[in-house]
């Protein structure tokens, strides 16, 4: 399969970036050590177990009528401490802290998708903008207004489309 991908000049850069992402992931796994620097006390449980990192992924860009294009990208993956406890000053109240692994800054890229089934006079390449996180960190989870959420069935993406298998994780064995 690698030989097939390397036949085309455009794919060589993609394969090199993909191999780089795999090597970075392997290095992260091999050099990862348990975090013994976190000393949890009864009053300090806010960062216990935080592990939020930028992770290489393959992002499949899709647009109706165009050939899907896998590109190397990044995503925020990990876990962040969340807790609920009795308030220290008001014992009849509870203190809550919900943290989520989220991006802190993002990068944007323009990618051209090949669209073979266009009408005469239309361009065969569609420019698509994509975003990826610059860095990741544990931040307070934000709520999303329900009115802004469109169910996949209504949007027409239940079986196919850009929301289905949007990111694929690189499998390391």
From Swiss-Prot:
Expressed in one to two pairs of neurons in each of the thoracic and abdominal neuromeres of the larval CNS. Coexpressed with CCAP in most CCAP-specific neurons. Coexpressed with Pburs in four bilateral neurons in thoracic and abdominal neuromeres of the ventral nervous system. The keyword Cell inner membrane does not apply. Residues 52-142 form the CTCK domain. Changing residue 148 to C: In allele Z5569; wing expansion defects, failure to sclerotize cuticle. The keyword Transport does not apply. One of its GO terms (cellular component) is extracellular region. InterPro entries: Cys_knot_C, Cystine-knot_cytokine, DAN. Changing residue 115 to Y: In allele Z1091; wing expansion defects, failure to sclerotize cuticle. Residues 1-32 form the signal peptide. One of its GO terms (biological process) is border follicle cell delamination. It holds the Pfam family DAN. Disulfide bonds join 52-101, 66-115, 76-136, 80-138, 98-141. It is found in: Secreted. GO terms for molecular function: hormone activity; protein heterodimerization activity; receptor ligand activity. Keywords: Disulfide bond, Hormone, Secreted, Signal. Final heterodimeric neurohormone released at the end of the molting cycle, involved in the sclerotization (tanning) of the insect cuticle, melanization and wing spreading. Heterodimer specifically activates the G protein-coupled receptor rk. Heterodimer of Burs and Pburs. This is Bursicon.
